[in-house]
């Protein structure tokens, strides 16, 4: 019985340590990208606090951390311009495309 319990505990530990494809940790928390055949795409990653209210016309402030996994699979609203359709003052987001087999060390 003890052996079975030990095996189950070890299996659960390994399962918990496994990485989820397209999931990475960034400054504010964990994000989930869109995994495609030859790349992973992260859309709408917040990189600073929204420049609204008291933060309007101020230098960017650090992003507010979130709990859980933030889905980063759709583009964030555009910055205010033109007719304002599909736009928002909350526009400090970035988009990242990475090769499917990205390496930890820099590429040339």
Language-model regions: role of each:
Residues 1-4:
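Positively charged n-region of N-terminal signal peptides that target proteins for export
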Residues 7-15:
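Bacterial N-terminal signal peptides
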């Amino acid at each position: 019985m003890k052996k079975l319990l030990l095996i189950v505990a070890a299996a659960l530990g390994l399962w918990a340590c496994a990485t989820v494809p397209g999931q990475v940790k960034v400054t504010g928390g964990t994000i989930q990208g869109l995994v495609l055949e030859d790349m992973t795409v992260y859309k709408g990653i917040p990189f600073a606090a929204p420049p609204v209210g008291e933060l309007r016309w101020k230098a960017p402030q650090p992003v507010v951390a979130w709990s859980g996994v933030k889905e980063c699979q759709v583009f964030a609203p555009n910055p205010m311009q033109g007719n304002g359709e599909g736009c928002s003052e909350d526009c400090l987001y970035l988009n990242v495309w990475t090769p499917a087999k990205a390496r930890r060390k820099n590429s040339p």
